[in-house]
């Protein structure tokens, strides 16, 4: 949610900032703005809507080599030009951008800013006005920022310009992601490394409650208490081409097509020279020592976790629970004696999951993160990390991260089984390779998927996905994808639950897409399809070779039953994509959604 960029160097700052913000569009936003330092002033440009609108508003004649930028996703105050960032202090000495939520901003207003007339409805403006108030009492900017941030409760990532110190960007962070990049004769600030890859691939992690003073030729990191911190940069292993669409119309379609290659990449990354799949010994020991696994996730990652539970229990025999992070945070169940917590997050920054992680670590429990972003908060703070190696996922609706998470969970399940001395009747790497081939075959059947979307979903307001066992998990994910990008009220249900209430919603023409890839429930789910068809539903069945019947809409290549979600999800993703396309929706940036949910 939201994105921050900052630049100080010798090049034209405004173009670097705008380009950086465009690379952060995937995070979701409703307004955007930049501020640049000229020889005599700080120029602020901000607009409601897309960055393309902001570009038109920026004065091309303004030249600057220092600036900050922001994409906003409203939390306090409606989306508007007034509430967009950057915000300025009363005298316009200070200009600030901020991600996060300041929980005690009303108290700060009452206690310190009673005589200050605020211009916006945001918590962000309180920060910049408070900093100016403190500076007016004789504190240096560094001291004022440190004191202000030390009194803030909640999450924040900030970048600040000071008109009286034009060659410095002040940066602070707590519970919200922010990086500082080290370049040649230039330094940058970014919520995500990909925003500033054109400037540098060398980045430094900022830790919670730290203040960073960024200048052209040096970077100083301090705690809010003033203690100097030394930290070397790491190399961001990203390629600029990874964050470009290439010949594709949308990132989502590109990322759907990348999934077979992601699975093959995971095989390569986790396969040893002898062909085995041994994970880190510490992870193996933690899994073996635990008496129950608690998977904690949100959204698409939660759906991957449901598949992971089945894999862990059926392959390794390890009892597993799956919990929605935001619910677990405030309604923790009774735990086993030796729990291991597995956090699944594409970004590694999900605020609800991090809240759970912090809580369970305080209780002394071990934690494992499965994420797509090395160096992310969850990967840094968990005891152990498994990377999914899916590459940057730009479209807001997750596709390749989901299948990558399932593949890594499958590897984890097999590794636990091997460590326990269990004999498995299948070769996971071979079965994953077969699944990747099947996924690639389905990605080449786009015309069929587009036809289903056109026939069933072009004008409907509602749609249902049904399945049983593993197919039910995919039904949940398929419904989420459809509602995310097409705005159709789509729901996923267990086939056996239809008669317990949901069937009352079936009308003439109601689209019902059924998944039928599980042999032991194949006839049962087909019976459910007949139930809704007899009440007027327009039905389409996604089945698998060997289980298919005449009239099935899509027949998947045969894969190992435990890995069917990797394959059966592809048609649901493509159907959602084409449904959104035909309905004129913004596929990559659906309304009201953020890619990385960094506030609760």
UniProtKB/Swiss-Prot annotation:
Enzyme Commission number, as recorded: 2.6.1.16
InterPro entries: GATase_2_dom, GFAT, GFAT_N, GlmS/AgaS_SIS, GlmS/FrlB_SIS, Ntn_hydrolases_N, SIS_dom, SIS_dom_sf
Compartments (UniProt record): Cytoplasm
Residue ranges occupied by any Glutamine amidotransferase type-2 domain in the UniProt entry: 2-217
The reaction(s) this protein catalyses: D-fructose 6-phosphate + L-glutamine = D-glucosamine 6-phosphate + L-glutamate
Active-site residues, as the UniProt record annotates them: 2, 595
GO molecular function, one term: glutamine-fructose-6-phosphate transaminase (isomerizing) activity
Any Pfam family matching the protein: SIS
GO BP terms: carbohydrate metabolic process; fructose 6-phosphate metabolic process; protein N-linked glycosylation; UDP-N-acetylglucosamine metabolic process
Domain SIS span(s) in chain numbering: 283-422, 452-590
Source superkingdom: Bacteria
Any single GO CC term annotated in Swiss-Prot or TrEMBL for this entry: cytosol
CDD domains referenced in this protein's UniProt entry, alphabetically: GFAT (cd00714), SIS_GlmS_GlmD_1 (cd05008), SIS_GlmS_GlmD_2 (cd05009)
Keyword line: Aminotransferase, Cytoplasm, Glutamine amidotransferase, Repeat, Transferase
Quaternary assembly: Homodimer.
Family matches, as HAMAP family: GlmS
Known function: Catalyzes the first step in hexosamine metabolism, converting fructose-6P into glucosamine-6P using glutamine as a nitrogen source.
PANTHER family cross-referenced by the UniProt entry: GLUCOSAMINE--FRUCTOSE-6-PHOSPHATE AMINOTRANSFERASE, ISOMERIZING, GLUTAMINE--FRUCTOSE-6-PHOSPHATE TRANSAMINASE (ISOMERIZING)
Name recorded for this polypeptide: Glutamine--fructose-6-phosphate aminotransferase [isomerizing]
Species the sequence originates in: Shouchella clausii (strain KSM-K16)
Gene name of the record: glmS
């Amino acid at each position: 949610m939201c994105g921050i960029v900052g630049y100080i160097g010798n090049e034209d700052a405004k173009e670097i900032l705008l380009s950086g913000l465009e690379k952060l569009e995937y995070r979701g936003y409703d307004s955007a703005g930049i501020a640049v330092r000229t020889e005599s002033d700080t120029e602020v440009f901000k607009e409601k809507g897309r960055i393309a609108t902001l570009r038109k508003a920026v004065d091309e004649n303004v030249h600057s080599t220092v600036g900050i930028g922001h994409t906003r996703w409203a939390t306090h105050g409606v989306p508007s030009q007034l509430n967009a960032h950057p915000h300025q202090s009363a005298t316009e000495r200070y200009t600030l951008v901020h991600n996060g939520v300041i929980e005690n901003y009303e108290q700060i207003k009452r206690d310190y800013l009673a005589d200050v007339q605020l211009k916006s409805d945001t918590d962000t403006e309180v920060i910049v006005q408070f900093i100016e108030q403190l500076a007016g009492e004789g504190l240096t900017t560094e001291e004022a920022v440190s004191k202000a941030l030390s009194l803030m409760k909640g999450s924040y990532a900030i970048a600040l310009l000071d008109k009286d110190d034009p060659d410095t960007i002040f940066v602070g962070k707590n519970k919200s992601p922010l990086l500082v990049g080290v370049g040649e004769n230039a330094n940058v600030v970014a919520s995500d490394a990909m925003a500033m890859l054109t400037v540098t691939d060398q980045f430094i992690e900022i830790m919670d409650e730290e203040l960073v003073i960024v200048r052209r030729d040096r970077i100083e990191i301090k705690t809010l208490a003033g203690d100097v911190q030394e930290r070397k940069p790491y190399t961001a292993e990203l390629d600029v081409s990874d964050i470009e669409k290439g010949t594709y119309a949308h990132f989502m379609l590109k990322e759907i097509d990348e999934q077979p290659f992601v699975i093959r990449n995971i095989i390569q990354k986790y396969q040893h020279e002898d062909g085995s799949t041994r994970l880190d010994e510490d992870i193996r020991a933690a899994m073996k020592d635990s008496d129950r696994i608690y998977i904690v996730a949100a959204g698409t990652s939660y759906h991957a976790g449901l598949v992971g539970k089945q894999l862990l229990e059926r392959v390794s025999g390890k009892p597993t629970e799956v919990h929605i992070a935001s619910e677990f945070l405030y309604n923790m169940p009774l735990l086993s004696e030796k729990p291991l917590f597995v956090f699944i997050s594409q970004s590694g920054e999900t605020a609800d999951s991090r809240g759970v992680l912090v809580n369970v670590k305080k209780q002394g429990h071990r934690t494992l993160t499965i994420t797509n972003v090395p160096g992310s908060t969850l990967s840094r703070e968990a005891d152990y990390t498994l990377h999914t190696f899916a590459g940057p996922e730009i479209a807001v609706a997750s596709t390749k991260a989901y299948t990558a998470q399932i593949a890594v969970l499958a590897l984890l399940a097999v590794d636990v089984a091997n460590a326990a001395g269990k004999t498995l009747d299948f070769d996971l790497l071979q079965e994953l390779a077969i699944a990747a081939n099947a996924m690639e075959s389905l990605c080449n059947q786009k015309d069929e998927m587009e036809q289903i979307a056109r026939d069933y979903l072009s004008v409907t307001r509602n749609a249902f996905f049904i399945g049983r066992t593993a197919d039910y998990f995919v039904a949940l994910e398929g419904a989420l994808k459809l509602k995310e990008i097409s705005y159709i009220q789509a729901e996923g249900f267990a086939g056996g639950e239809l008669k317990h209430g949901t069937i009352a919603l079936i009308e003439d023409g109601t689209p019902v897409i059924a998944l039928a890839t599980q042999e032991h429930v194949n006839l049962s789910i087909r019976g459910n399809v007949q139930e809704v068809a007899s009440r007027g539903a327009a039905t389409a069945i996604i089945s698998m070779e060997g289980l298919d019947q005449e009239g099935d809409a899509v027949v998947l290549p045969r894969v190992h039953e435990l890995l069917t979600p990797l394959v059966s999800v592809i048609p649901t993703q493509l159907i959602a994509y084409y449904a959104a396309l035909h309905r004129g929706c913004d596929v990559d940036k659906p309304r009201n959604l953020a890619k990385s949910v960094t506030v609760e």
